[in-house]
C-alpha cells in the first residue's frame, strides 16, 4: 500500500525570471512562487516491531522500587513518608470551608496507621464510618464510652 504526502507552500523570494526588481513596473505586486513537493511512502513491507524498537535497560533497584509501590495496598487516611514511616490523619468537620485535619500519628507499618484511622473514624463519626478493615461489630466499650461522654461521667479509655 502506497501513501502520498503532498506538501505545498509559497516561496515569496522565488522569481520566474532572473531580471532585477528595478525593471518591473512599480504597480505590479510580488506574488511569489507556489511549490508542491510529493513524498511517496510504501507500506507494503512493514518492519518487524521487535527489530525497530530500542531495548532500554532499567536498573534493578528502580524496578524493585516500582514494583513495591505498585503492590502496596493503599489505606484510607494513610500515607507514607519519604523516609519510610507511615502517617495517619483523619479529616472531619469544617474549618473555614475545608475539612479539619486531625493528626493521628506516625507508625512503622501501613496496617498500624490504618487501624489508628479506623479507631478514630469510629469514635468521631460512629459505627457507620468508612473504615479500612470493614465494619467491626460495635464493641460494648465504645458504646460505654459514648454513653459516659454524653452523661458527663468518668470516661473509659477504648483501646
From Swiss-Prot:
GO BP annotations, alphabetical order: ethylene-activated signaling pathway
One Pfam family cited in the UniProt record for this chain: AP2
Keywords: Activator, DNA-binding, Ethylene signaling pathway, Nucleus, Transcription, Transcription regulation
Keyword Transmembrane: no
One Gene Ontology CC term in the entry: nucleus
Domain of life: Eukaryota
Xref: SMART domains: AP2 (SM00380)
Alphabetized Gene3D superfamilies for the sequence: AP2/ERF domain
SUPFAM superfamilies from the UniProt entry: DNA-binding domain (SSF54171)
A GO term for molecular function: transcription cis-regulatory region binding
DNA bind region: 74-134
Compartments, record wording: Nucleus
Comp. bias intervals (Basic and acidic residues): 136-148
Region (Disordered): 1-36, 128-159
Family (UniProt): Belongs to the AP2/ERF transcription factor family. ERF subfamily.
Known role: Probably acts as a transcriptional activator. Binds to the GCC-box pathogenesis-related promoter element. May be involved in the regulation of gene expression by stress factors and by components of stress signal transduction pathways.
Protein name as it appears in the record: Ethylene-responsive transcription factor ERF069
Lineage start: Eukaryota, Viridiplantae, Streptophyta, Embryophyta, Tracheophyta
